[in-house]
């Protein structure tokens, strides 16, 4: 789950769409309204689905996926992955922007993050086994995709 999904959850719970719309949710809200015409329960179903999403996902012993960042203490390699996951806060995983080029390597995991566009908006930035995949498409950069099976990169 990312910060824009959190905007939707806040909107649904508080019936206040200002923050979401201010941060680019207009077309998504319009599409939700259109879907509600076909299925009156669509918004509730979407809420239930998004509420079930995690802010951090661990795939086997290979990958850690999170929207913005993962908190890793200086001695992170002394902890197992479950302890690392327990240290996380959703605010940090959804909003942090202070890790680029300051990240720590955690065991042999490849950490995949987005949220903060990389400076060179034409390719994925890799640093210390962390892959920054936000290539700034919203600002005219590339839309990047990283296929985890073979780490092949695709750009549009």
List each language-model region with its residue ranges.
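Glycine-rich, phosphate-binding/catalytic loops in enzymes
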Residues: 15-18, 82-83, 128-131, 149
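His/acidic metal-ligating clusters that form di-metal
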Residues: 40-71, 76-121
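Short glycine-/acidic-enriched loop or helix-start segments at secondary-structure transitions
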Residues: 9-11, 75-77, 121-124, 142
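Single, functionally critical "micro-switch" positions that shape active/binding sites
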Residues: 1-2, 66, 114, 133
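Active-site neighborhood of divalent metal-dependent phosphoester bond hydrolases
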Residues: 1-59, 92-94
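Short, surface-exposed, polar/charged, turn-prone segments marking secondary-structure boundaries
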Residues: 26-29, 86, 91-95, 138-142
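Catalytic metal-binding/acid-base residues of hydrolase active sites
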Residues: 4-5, 69-71, 117, 136-138
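Conserved beta-sheet core of the metallophosphoesterase superfamily
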Residues: 96-156
């Amino acid at each position: 789950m990312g910060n824009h999904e959190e905007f939707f959850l806040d909107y649904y719970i508080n019936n206040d769409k200002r923050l979401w719309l201010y941060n680019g949710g207009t077309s998504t809200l319009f599409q939700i309204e259109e879907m509600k015409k076909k299925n009156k329960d669509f918004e509730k179903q979407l809420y239930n689905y998004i509420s079930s999403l995690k802010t951090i996902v661990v795939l086997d012993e290979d990958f850690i996926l999170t929207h913005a960042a993962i908190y890793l203490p200086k001695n992170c390699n002394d902890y197992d992955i479950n302890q690392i996951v327990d240290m996380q806060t959703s605010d940090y995983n959804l909003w942090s922007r202070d890790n680029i080029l300051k990240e720590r390597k955690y065991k042999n995991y490849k950490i995949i993050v987005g949220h903060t566009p990389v400076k060179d908006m034409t390719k994925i930035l890799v640093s210390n086994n962390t892959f920054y995949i936000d290539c700034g498409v919203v600002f005219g950069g590339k839309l990047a995709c990283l296929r985890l099976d073979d780490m092949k990169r695709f750009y549009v």
